[in-house]
Structures are given as C-alpha cells and as structure tokens.
Amino acid sequence: MTGCSPVFAMQHVVGVPRILVRRTFLGTDVTMTRTLCSPGPREKRPEAAALGLFHRLPELGRTLSHTVRHQAASTAKAWWDRYEEFVGLNEVREAQGNVTEAEKVFMVARGLVREAREGLEAQQTKLKEVRDRLDRVSREDNQYLELATLEHRMLQEEKRLRIAYLRAEDSEREKFSLFSAAVRESHEKERTRAERTKNWSLIGSVLGALIGVAGSTYVNRVRLQELKALLLEAQKGPASLQEAIREQASSYSLQQKDLQDLMMDLRGLVHAEQGQGSGSPTGSSTRGKDIDGLSATMKEQLRHSRQVYSCLEGLREQLDGLEKTCSQMAGVLQLAQAPAHPGTVGPVDGALPSSLLEHGSVILALSEMEQRLEAQANRNTVSSTLVTCVTFLATLPLLYMLFKTS
C-alpha cells in the first residue's frame, strides 16, 4: 500500500475509532478521523414512566415500611431504656451479671481446689506405699537407699502439692468472698428498686386520690350550679306568669266594665225609643247612625274580649304546665332532702296547692332547698376529703412497717 498514487489505508487503534490515512504524492500523510457519537437519550413516553413508577411502588412500599418499623423499634427501645434506667432495672441487671461472673470464677477456683486435693491424696497414697516397702526392707540392703531417695523426692512433691492446695483454698475463699459480695450487692440493688417502685406507686396512689377528690369536687360544684340555674328559672317562671295573668285580668276587667257601660247605654236608647214612639225622619236617621256606631263598637269589644279570653286560656295552660313542673321539682327536691331528713318524705305525685303559687311559698321553698343542697354538697366534699386524708394517714404506718421489715 505504498507508492506515489494516493491510497487510503484504514488503521485500527485500540480505544480509538477507525482512522482514515491518505498518502499524497509528496509523501505526506493527511489523517482524517471519523468520530462516532452515541445517539442522544430518547424521551420516555408517559405510559412508560407510569409503568416504571408502578413497578417501583412495591419496592418503595417495602423500603418505607422497613424504615417505619426501624424508627418505631428504635423509639420504643429508647423509651424502654429510659424506663429501665428510671426504675433501676439496668443496675439490677448489671449486678446480676456481676453475680454470674463471680459464680463462674468461684466454680473454676473450686475445680482447682478439687484437683489439688486429689493430687495431694494420690501423692500421700504413693508415699504410704513407699514407706511400707521401706519398713519391710532391711537397712543393709541396697534397695533401702533407693527407697529412701524415692521417699525424699515424694516428700518434696507432697510439700509442693500441699502448698498448691493451700493456695487453691485461699483463692477459693477469696473468690467466694467476691461472690458473696456480688450477691449482697445484687440483693441490695433489688431491694432498692423494690423500695423505689413502692414509693412511686404510693406517690401515684396519693396523686390519684387527690385527682379523684378534685374531680368529685368539680363535678359536685357543676351539678350545684346546674341546680341553681334550674331553681332560678323555676323562681322566675311563676313571677312572670303571675304578672302576665294580672295584666290580662286587669285588661279583661276593663273590657267587661266598658261592655257593661255599653249595655247600659243600649238599654237607655231602647227605652228612649219606646217612649218617644214615632218621630221625625231626621231623628230616626240620627238614631240609626248612633245604633250602627254602637253595634260596631260592640262587635269590636266582643272581638277583643274573645282575644283576651283566648290569651287567658293559653296562660292557664302554661300555668298548669308550670304547676306540673313545680310539682316534679318539689318531688326531686324532697328526694334530695330525704338523706338529710329520713322519715320526712311524703307523697309528691299530686300537684302543688294553689296557695303556694298565690303567696310565694314555692319560691321560698325552692330557695331553702337550694341552700340545703349547697350545704349537703359542701358536706359531701368535706367528708370525702376527710376520708381520703384519714385513709392516707392510716396507711402510712402500715407502709412504714412493711418497708422496715422488707
């Protein structure tokens, strides 16, 4: 591919796109490089994006649930650790762990003592056998010297084993003392935790009793206020109805008086008409006009009387309803008064007498009953408070004796 004519040569370079080399007539090379570029990212369709999101939803849900569970577990563990630290369970658990470790060390020391004792006993047995043989051998025999030397070595070994045994016993005693101290510390921590729990339970019970007393006092006060409101309404009701009845009765009496005067005038006109007989037409027309005016006035008075009568009927119905309500109120008040004055409860089914409504005795009875209810509510509150205080004071010595014995 060499020569004077232009030739195109394709050369392959590692990691580089193909290079086109052109050789000219003068021998110079002109390099032309063709670069290859990747196509741009294609835009995703909305359907594809939605489908991908749908496929990723389960994984997102699992990740979210795992995160929520992890956070909930960490939060619960943190609060539980705080509770254990507040109550003292951490100290008790740590003391129990120390007891377990001390027990393990003590058991190891006991094993060493057992091994040392067994070795010492075996050595003493061997020494006894050697001494028995030495006693049976004559002093002139050559074996006597060997047995004496063996006895000497065994005595030295026995001394070493005895020292090791004594050291093991001392170590066992030390480990046992540490184990006993750990057990005492654990018992002390457990007793402290129990006392702390009892104290907090006592404080909680006292606070609960105080909250109960305060709640009962508040409820009694609210009920007393409601009873006061009902009594005030009951007191206002008869007074307003009595005023309305008085006004309607006065207007009715005035209407009756006007009607009687009108009737008297009519009678006088009739008698005058009969006495005069037949008269002039002018006089007859004047009397006719007077009669028409009087008839219109009479009709108006009759219509007004009917309205007044209907109003009085309505007021009478309201008064009957109020009497029933007052009788029910009186029954309720008598039932409320029954615990304070037993044996004085009478029938309350009947309606109240009209003299109470006329002379205002119902209002006085209601006010008196209001005072009695207020005094009874105050007595109940004071008695409940005294009972709670006495119970607390009576419980204190028992709790002190219980804590002292424990």
UniProtKB/Swiss-Prot annotation:
Transit peptide location on this chain: 1-35
One GO CC term on file: mitochondrial ATP-gated potassium channel complex
Principal localisation: mitochondrion
Protein's UniProt name: Mitochondrial potassium channel
Entry keywords, A to Z: Coiled coil, Ion channel, Ion transport, Membrane, Mitochondrion, Mitochondrion inner membrane, Potassium, Potassium channel, Potassium transport, Transit peptide, Transmembrane, Transmembrane helix, Transport
Summary of activators and inhibitors of this protein: Inhibited by ATP via mitoK(ATP) channel.
Entry-linked InterPro entries: CCDC51
UniProt subunit comment: The mitochondrial potassium channel (mitoK(ATP)) is composed of 4 subunits of CCDC51/MITOK and 4 subunits of ABCB8/MITOSUR.
Single GO molecular function: mitochondrial ATP-gated potassium channel activity
Coiled-coil ranges from the UniProt annotation: 113-140
Highest taxon, organism lineage: Eukaryota
Compartment list: Mitochondrion inner membrane
Organism the protein comes from: Mus musculus
Parts of the chain on the Mitochondrial intermembrane side: 220-382
Lipid bilayer topology: Multi-pass membrane protein
Free-text disruption phenotype from the record: Knockout mice exhibit no visible phenotype. Mutant mice are slightly more sensitive to the ischaemia-reperfusion protocol.
Keyword Membrane: yes
A biological process from GO: potassium ion transmembrane transport
Stated role: Pore-forming subunit of the mitochondrial ATP-gated potassium channel (mitoK(ATP)). Together with ATP-binding subunit ABCB8/MITOSUR of the mitoK(ATP) channel, mediates ATP-dependent K(+) currents across the mitochondrial inner membrane. An increase in ATP intracellular levels closes the channel, inhibiting K(+) transport, whereas a decrease in ATP levels enhances K(+) uptake in the mitochondrial matrix. May contribute to the homeostatic control of cellular metabolism under stress conditions by regulating the mitochondrial matrix volume.
Topological domains, Mitochondrial matrix: 36-198, 404-406
Enzymatic reactions: K(+)(in) = K(+)(out)
Transmembrane segments: 199-219, 383-403
